[in-house]
Amino acid sequence: MPRPELPLPEGWEEARDFDGKVYYIDHTNRTTSWIDPRDRYTKPLTFADCISDELPLGWEEAYDPQVGDYFIDHNTKTTQIEDPRVQWRREQEHMLKDYLVVAQEALSAQKEIYQVKQQRLELAQQEYQQLHAVWEHKLGSQVSLVSGSSSSSKYDPEILKAEIATAKSRVNKLKREMVHLQHELQFKERGFQTLKKIDKKMSDAQGSYKLDEAQAVLRETKAIKKAITCGEKEKQDLIKSLAMLKDGFRTDRGSHSDLWSSSSSLESSSFPLPKQYLDVSSQTDISGSFGINSNNQLAEKVRLRLRYEEAKRRIANLKIQLAKLDSEAWPGVLDSERDRLILINEKEELLKEMRFISPRKWTQGEVEQLEMARKRLEKDLQAARDTQSKALTERLKLNSKRNQLVRELEEATRQVATLHSQLKSLSSSMQSLSSGSSPGSLTSSRGSLVASSLDSSTSASFTDLYYDPFEQLDSELQSKVEFLLLEGATGFRPSGCITTIHEDEVAKTQKAEGGGRLQALRSLSGTPKSMTSLSPRSSLSSPSPPCSPLMADPLLAGDAFLNSLEFEDPELSATLCELSLGNSAQERYRLEEPGTEGKQLGQAVNTAQGCGLKVACVSAAVSDESVAGDSGVYEASVQRLGASEAAAFDSDESEAVGATRIQIALKYDEKNKQFAILIIQLSNLSALLQQQDQKVNIRVAVLPCSESTTCLFRTRPLDASDTLVFNEVFWVSMSYPALHQKTLRVDVCTTDRSHLEECLGGAQISLAEVCRSGERSTRWYNLLSYKYLKKQSRELKPVGVMAPASGPASTDAVSALLEQTAVELEKRQEGRSSTQTLEDSWRYEETSENEAVAEEEEEEVEEEEGEEDVFTEKASPDMDGYPALKVDKETNTETPAPSPTVVRPKDRRVGTPSQGPFLRGSTIIRSKTFSPGPQSQYVCRLNRSDSDSSTLSKKPPFVRNSLERRSVRMKRPSSVKSLRSERLIRTSLDLELDLQATRTWHSQLTQEISVLKELKEQLEQAKSHGEKELPQWLREDERFRLLLRMLEKRQMDRAEHKGELQTDKMMRAAAKDVHRLRGQSCKEPPEVQSFREKMAFFTRPRMNIPALSADDV
């Protein structure tokens, strides 16, 4: 019988409290009760008897405006916020205990990482001290530095300088890493202890919060969040003041120190071009698009609108994909695996440094201890490789895919923000964009991408607290993961493949036998015909980089030295006297020949005995046809002249007979200002090394080396065989203009038992034409044998080794010799066949007409440099039969003939299939890809609406007075706001985690504010002392460089700053949308996701403002 139909027992009465709550009076016992006495007959007595969601006798569900739903147990006269019908609290306790085990493992692994780093720091300090002592000893005799050391010596002056700079940079970097790691350890240790206290507190019998206790916790949490909001405002004010202080310092000193030669920019170059030729990437925009015609505004507007809608659809798809990936892994799982992976890499790095350290001044006991430590470390590493799990590989693969999606989402949001601003500036009435009337609008109330004003950077919310938007791995680990998964194998990586993270190197992979080979990315341009690149990726007058002024090595970049002589660099000319030069103009190796469009660069490494040979290294510069292939302005020629001559040089199949070759991939990361060098494999090693019982490694140096950058790296040693697979990557922090002035030196070396290094062969690669777009180019390079080079130098010694000379006579003699050998080479190359073998090229000849030819060529240069805006390149004999092409400046040309190119006269090479003269004329051949007028009429439909928009509509037909067509945003009243369909179940454990998390957040914010205040004091003190440059440690620390970028954003002009702010808001909103979508698509309930994020917060430090650096060496 239902309770309302049952009468109250005798002596009972129903009454109401002053707030309307019903209670019952027992007149017999003179007591009151909240429990209806009839419930004894209608309700279950225990929870075991309950059906569905009913509560047993004596339990009541109530609501508090501050706490929310809570439950009252009238039997014990207590309250609790946990639902007694749900066993969620017990599951939370189990999850917390499991997470404590994982966190303990990660913490112990990170402590071991710190110990290994400490050992590495001690070794690096010892190595730096030894190298510095060797440098001081060698510095006493400059003659021995130049003449006494060969290119294969460990103490080659330039290599020794790079060793010292790398060792110094390694010591400083390890110090900074240890300081950062120490702060992370402290944060994780505190978080781990906090979780342990929470677990102990909540495991007790009185672990549940009552109503008044929960209200007190919420009040404290709210007060801390207010303090956090004030702290965030103070932090932003400090950053603004730092941005103002930063303006008084020069922040680009690092690039200036690397650019020791002349600037490569057009404005500072001696290469006078008209203003309209300064941008060759799109000549159609020079004179034809200065302003958009009013007749074309509608078409431009429609085009931008379509791109805008497409970008928004792309963002929506990316958010769905990210939400799906995030639902497959919960926070904290990857952390322990990542720490174990980092620990293995740190141990391998320590092992590598133990192998390469030179124990010259060590005692026998110290050497034996080093060997024992090395063997013990090898055993530990082998055990770690054997226990590597397949699950780790799969999780790393998912994480790599997620980071790729995050990068794509960032690009898409930036594109949407840019298109939004363009649309607003294009039309005088863009109210339809900002009105929120169209579904999916940037600022619409539904489906908004832009975060509301409540989600400002200074407001504290639990979403910002627990959910770090799109947190990625650090750059080193992320790059390692990407290269780890390069092979694309879905199966388990075999043991023995975990590789090393070097100082600035990151990821290395080792392919399993029979695995898929890394495919080389073929270049879109052929072999260069001149030192100057006409690629839109680089400056028009960018020369190939000169070699180091202290390069006492016959392996020299001849292009670079000849090009530098054109600029008449007196310092370089004087330094050339230190080099071992011969009187002859012998040709040692074949010159590169042009490949057809789309083929890979020639693989032959071209070297010279002295500086006279035009090409002594493989230049990475693009071909003269790069304008046609890359910019889209000219149509690339179908067939280049001399293609038959290039057949032996333009592909991987053109391997020189008996030459050792190395495959290298180069990539520049514009966002992080880092240059990646991937050493893939070495083939035909038997040509350099006869004994197969030695270990071989690759030494890589970026020369000339600056003092503040790690520029010398070594791969791990492998047992000698005909083909060696390394797959190791090295990262160099460097600006893109500075990279253009660098040369990459690659040496194959062996190390004996006494740790002495001997170089067998090498090559030098120009970095002048490294692509800025982030694409990776993979090429093969032939290596020059140093033994063969020394043998030839002993046979031919007409000049001998010259000591450093500073007089003008020596400089003139070297310059004359260089010009003489260069012209000799040009004359000899005209009559040579492209199939001439390497042995035939070693001939000694002299020509008496060199000086006269050189003088005539210099006169040509002076005459042609006098022209203001047209440069004519003298055609080769093969081009005499081709008529000159006439081109209009404002249009493009389409012809199967070679594309005209602007080239400096001394940069051209004789025997090259050269181009026709670049002259003005009346004949105009228009490109298929561009026309000044519309090919067909635009079909426009005007829509009459409240917003008076005239864009091409994709919406349903117009309906007058419809809400979706109004220009004024219609806000829903608060009464109609939909309530949450589900309410998260909150327990006492959730409240305690929230309280401790806000305390931790506030503590971390206080530390960041103190760091910013200290940094501000240091900068003010440096400014008061008259210093013009930022401290060196501040420029080198990667985390502080990110802070400097943040400061630079604040100094942008108003339009750029507004666009950056809009992009940041969109990314924050997208992160929250992904978080919301993940809760909808995840198989687990949202309570589980939320609780895991709360636990992971305490052991995942977010160091937004790093600690101040330790003292440098």
Swiss-Prot record:
Position of the signal peptide: none
Tissue spec. comment: Expressed in mammary epithelial cells and breast cancer cell lines. Found in the luminal epithelium surrounding the ducts in the normal breast. In the brain, expressed in somatodendritic compartment of neurons in the cortex and hippocampus and in the cerebellum it is found in the Purkinje cells and some granule cells (at protein level). Detected in brain, heart, colon and kidney. In the kidney, expressed in glomerular podocytes, in some tubules and in the collecting duct.
PTM comment: Phosphorylation at Ser-542 and Ser-931 by CDK1 in response to spindle damage stress regulates mitotic exit, these two sites are dephosphorylated by CDC14B.
Region annotation (Disordered) ranges: 429-448, 522-547, 825-975
GO CC aspect terms: cytoplasm; cytosol; nucleus; perinuclear region of cytoplasm; ruffle membrane
SMART domains given in the database record: WW
Entry similarity comment: Belongs to the WWC family. KIBRA subfamily.
Name of the protein in question: Protein KIBRA
Organism: Homo sapiens (Human)
Gene that this polypeptide is encoded by: WWC1
